[in-house]
A protein has these predicted regions:
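C-terminal and inter-domain tail/linker signature
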Residues: 1-132
């Protein structure tokens, strides 16, 4: 396994802090809730081909906000935002939001500018993602 791990889960690496035993992970897109560090690790274990990398991590008191990229092994790069709520330095509640990049709708092309996404920026490119 390449890359450095910070704890027993990929989520702990993404957040940069350990998970509390009773950590709750929320996925609003699917109306799902994963309860407990051990179960979070078990769910992650079903995605062996995953590579990921953090682009930016902001700590605001007892809140961590992380922008990161993930490839589930099918070369579709999802861009994510994860919000972790901390108690005593451990994540107790985490909410993940993600989306697969899509093309700009034709009607909007003339109204917007292209967002520059350098490979080593906030949204790491596919070649910078690692197994954790």
């Amino acid at each position: 396994m390449e890359g450095k791990r910070n704890g027993q889960t990929r989520l702990a690496y993404v957040l940069g802090v350990p998970l509390a035993d009773n950590c709750v992970r929320q996925w609003p897109q699917m109306q799902e809730l994963v309860q407990g560090r051990e179960l979070i690790g078990s769910v992650e274990g079903n995605f062996e081909a995953v590579t990921l990398e953090v682009g930016r991590r902001l700590r605001l008191g007892d809140v961590v906000v992380v922008e990161w990229s993930i490839n589930y092994g099918d070369d579709r790069i999802y861009r994510n935002v994860t919000i972790g709520e901390l108690e005593h330095g451990e994540a107790v509640r985490v909410t993940d939001y993600w989306g697969e990049p899509v093309n700009t709708p034709e009607w909007r092309v003339e109204m917007t500018a292209r967002l520059e996404m350098p490979p080593d920026g906030v949204w790491p490119s596919k070649d910078r993602l690692k197994h954790y």
